[in-house]
Amino acid sequence: MSSDIFGNLMDWGQAMDKLNQIKQLKTLNEHQPGLARILRYRDNWRLRETVLNYVKDITHPSDDLLTEVLNIVMDENIYYDARIIAVDALASLMNNCKYNKESNRIDKSDINEKIKALLVSPHPPIFHEAIRRSYQNFANG
């Protein structure tokens, strides 16, 4: 995988340009460490949401990227719109793991348990609905 090309995330315009460029070039797989770093960066919702939408196209997700997307799904301090986008992204990534010949070290059953726990905890119906809609992908991932 390539080194992190995104530089200073406070200069979000430049980071967004690089995101759009690697999306167009279809090289997202090669930039997963940088994408995970953007997901850890809490000070720009546009970057986070863009990455969450773009990672759905990653064919061989790294454990670090899966973990960061799961962290957003689970984080009670993040607004629900981003968490719902993260649920969809996680479902796509888990589905892509099924077709990945390389075995990820991340425990997929642990992800399933965390997702199930969200369904029985108090959250808005729209969040539960997004989880249920995507749960088949988690269960089969």
Predicted features along the sequence, with ranges:
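Amphipathic alpha-helical scaffolding segments comprising HEAT/armadillo-like alpha-solenoid repeats
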Residues: 2-3, 26-39, 60-74, 96-117, ...
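Structural signature of alpha-helical solenoid repeat scaffolds
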Residues: 20-23, 55-56, 91-95, 135-136
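Conserved hydrophobic register position within alpha-solenoid helical repeats
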Residues: 18-21, 51, 86, 130-131, ...
